[in-house]
């Protein structure tokens, strides 16, 4: 005859097809796997949002969640006290939100990993600093960690899903012409001249 205790209703996690996650099928991502590809704070954000709604939990959701985390971090810089309370990152960090400028999104960083074929943080930092000369690893610890996560995620998830088309005869000739053009370039040439040669090779083939 007493008042029933207040319960907390929650939904199960689903895979990318909307089906229940099964250990035997391996159709999801574990906590340990998430933490290999992104920060604990990004996982906390994912868990914090919409606890009563069934959510899809799979590897491809990680970049989107990380970018949401970075976006909330940026918004927090210009929010008042009331707005901060509505910002999930404020709760993720217990009110102590790190102050660091966002260099680029995680999705863009993944594209840079693919384009540069970088396999180490040091190499990827060199590419980043070509466009952002006033940044350093020590002053951007969150971004430094993101670089490591991006390389790991690309190699484990994106790269394994890549399917490369076998070039036909005309495409093979065009690629061979491009290789010859690049081999003819030297360190004394301006980037603009190299770009012009590459463009001309493409038009000719």
Named regions from a protein language model:
Residues 130-205:
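Basic, alpha-helical terminal appendages of large translation-related enzymes
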């Amino acid at each position: 005859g007493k008042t029933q205790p207040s319960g907390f209703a929650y939904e199960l996690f689903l895979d990318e097809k909307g089906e229940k996650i099964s250990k035997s099928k391996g159709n999801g991502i574990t906590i340990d796997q998430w933490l290999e590809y992104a920060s604990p704070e990004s996982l906390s954000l994912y868990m914090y949002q919409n606890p009563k709604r069934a959510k899809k939990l799979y590897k491809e959701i990680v970049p989107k969640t990380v970018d949401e985390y970075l976006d909330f971090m940026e918004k927090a810089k210009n929010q008042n006290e009331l707005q901060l309370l509505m910002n999930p990152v404020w709760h993720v960090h217990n009110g102590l939100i790190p102050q660091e400028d966002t260099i680029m999104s995680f999705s863009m960083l993944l594209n840079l990993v693919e384009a540069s074929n970088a396999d180490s943080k040091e190499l990827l930092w060199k590419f980043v600093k070509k466009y952002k000369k006033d940044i350093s690893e020590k002053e951007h610890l969150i971004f430094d960690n993101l670089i490591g996560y991006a390389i790991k995620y690309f190699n484990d998830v994106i790269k394994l899903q890549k399917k490369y088309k076998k070039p036909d005869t005309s495409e093979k000739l065009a690629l061979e012409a491009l290789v010859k053009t690049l081999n003819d370039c030297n360190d004394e040439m301006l980037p603009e001249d190299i770009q012009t040669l590459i463009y001309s090779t493409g038009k000719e083939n």
